[in-house]
From Swiss-Prot:
Gene designation per UniProt: RGMB
GPI-anchor amidated asparagine: lipidated positions: 413
Source organism: Homo sapiens (Human)
Residues making up the signal peptide according to the UniProt record: 1-45
Polar residues bias (residue ranges): 121-133
Keyword terms: Autocatalytic cleavage, Cell membrane, Disulfide bond, Glycoprotein, GPI-anchor, Lipoprotein, Membrane, Signal
Transmembrane stretches, start-end: none
Maturation and modification: GPI-anchored.
GO biological process: BMP signaling pathway; cell adhesion; positive regulation of DNA-templated transcription; signal transduction
Region annotation Disordered: where it falls in the sequence: 121-153
Propeptide residues, chain positions: 414-437
Name of this protein: Repulsive guidance molecule B
Cysteine pairs bridged by disulfides in the record: 139-226, 163-312
Length: 437
């Protein structure tokens, strides 16, 4: 019974690895080959029990064990996946004589060849080992996290959290709560035992409580042999591709357990901290900065009581939130804005024109679309449209759960929502008025 059950779980794990690599795309030929392989395994599991001792089932099970915890959104995926593929290929070679004529074996060999071609894996190079003690890398979070799970018999991959800040400013917390806040001045987004992130927000327009981010400071704390403390700082019109000490990486020069990658000069950089499994995106859109972070839950929640003021963890203080709790306001989408100084300040933007401009970039009318409309009406700055769009792109790149990418303000089916933090469909007008009080 054990041999017959294994391929089924293997198929699910292999499919999950492919889905993480290309979310939302049609299954590639490779996945179909793997599914065919595992289906054949279900039908012919008995083939591996013949006196010749074909061990293709063991090779396949080991490969699934080595790859089921990997995630393509995290730095180092390709390297680890190729190592596992080479180990899989080596295993099939060692059992080739015993598996001659076995359809499952030959399907596996074909699948491995296609996988290595699609992933651009070289045939020569390091391989993964099914013994986690051998492959343990203290400066690769995914390596030692996977080893711990393997020892415990836990096949669930590490849990990751996402936090983002953009626009006027809009905060998405680790709990997927969505808030619009004032938070003028310097505020900590994250302050745990591994990472500190602080943002500084300044007023956007005179007479308004709306602010936006013009400075970001990130401290990667020293981590024994993996990296010395590294500080990154970005301000408006100065988005460097290096830490403040002039370096672009931390730790061993070959391993690069911490590194900066410049994607668009002066506008977009990424920081990959392999030793803590963390990825940070920093962008400048218009005059202001945006931030997106993906971090393992066990590390993100590792902090002392004195570090409880973290916007990514607990959200903005109530006194700093711009919410719709100031009165009973009916849904205003499709209605006209009241005649206020806001309309006089930016006559080019009405609710209708703001909706139209935001819809061009974001066809799904989720909370990011609503934030875009809100920012246009409160600031008159068209760059906030691009900021909301890039923030959504960062969610799609870093958020671990695809079903939570879009947050809908009026959702009643369990979809994450801003709740009392921001219910845009019930309060855009009220929010705009509050900003200018």
């Amino acid at each position: 019974m054990g041999l017959r059950a294994a391929p089924s779980s293997a198929a699910a794990a292999a499919a999950e690895v492919e889905q993480r690599r290309s979310p939302g795309l049609c299954p590639p030929p490779l996945e179909l080959l793997l599914l065919l392989l595992f289906s054949l395994g279900l039908l012919h599991a008995g083939d591996c029990q013949q006196p010749a001792q074909c061990r293709i089932q063991k090779c396949t099970t080991d490969f699934v064990s080595l790859t089921s915890h990997l995630n393509s959104a995290v730095d180092g995926f390709d390297s680890e996946f190729c190592k596992a593929l080479r180990a899989y290929a080596g295993c099939t070679q060692r059992t080739s004589k015993a598996c001659r004529g076995n359809l499952v074996y030959h399907s596996a060999v074909l699948g491995i060849s296609d996988l290595m071609s699609q992933r651009n894996c070289s045939k020569d190079g390091p391989t993964s080992s099914t013994n986690p003690e051998v492959t343990h890398d203290p400066c690769n979070y995914h390596s030692h996290a996977g080893a711990r799970e393997h020892r415990r018999g836990d096949q669930n991959p590490p849990s990751y959290l996402f936090c983002g800040l953009f626009g006027d400013p809009h905060l998405r917390t680790f709990k997927d709560n969505f808030q619009t806040c004032k938070v003028e001045g310097a505020w900590p987004l994250i302050d745990n035992n591994y990472l500190s992130v602080q943002v500084t927000n300044v007023p956007v327009v005179p007479g308004s409580s709306a602010t936006a981010t013009n400075k970001i400071t990130i401290i990667f704390k020293a981590h024994h042999e993996c990296t010395d403390q590294k500080v990154y700082q970005a301000v408006t019109d100065d988005l460097p591709a290096a830490f403040v000490d002039g370096t672009t990486s931390g730790g061993d020069s070959d391993a690069k357990s911490l590194r900066i990658v410049e994607r668009e000069s002066g506008h977009y950089v990424e920081m990959h901290a392999r030793y803590i499994g963390t990825t940070v995106f920093v962008r400048q859109v218009g005059r202001y900065l945006t931030l997106a972070i993906r971090m393992p839950e066990d590390l993100a929640m590792s902090y002392e009581e004195s570090q409880d003021l973290q916007l990514c963890v607990n959200g903005c203080p109530l006194s700093e939130r711009i919410d719709d709790g100031q009165g009973q306001v009916s849904a205003i989408l499709g209605h006209s804005l009241p005649r206020t100084s806001l309309v006089q300040a930016w006559p080019g933007y009405t609710l209708e024109t703001a909706n139209t401009q935001c819809h061009e970039k974001m066809p799904v009318k989720d909370i990011y679309f609503q934030s875009c409309v809100f920012d246009l009406l409160t600031t008159g700055d068209a760059n906030f449209t691009a900021a909301a769009h890039s923030a959504l792109e960062d969610v799609e790149a870093l958020h671990p759960r695809k079903e939570r990418w879009h947050i809908f303000p009026s959702s009643g089916n369990g979809t994450p929502r801003g709740g009392s933090d921001l219910s845009v469909s019930l309060g855009l007008t009220c929010l705009i008025l509050i900003v200018f009080l």
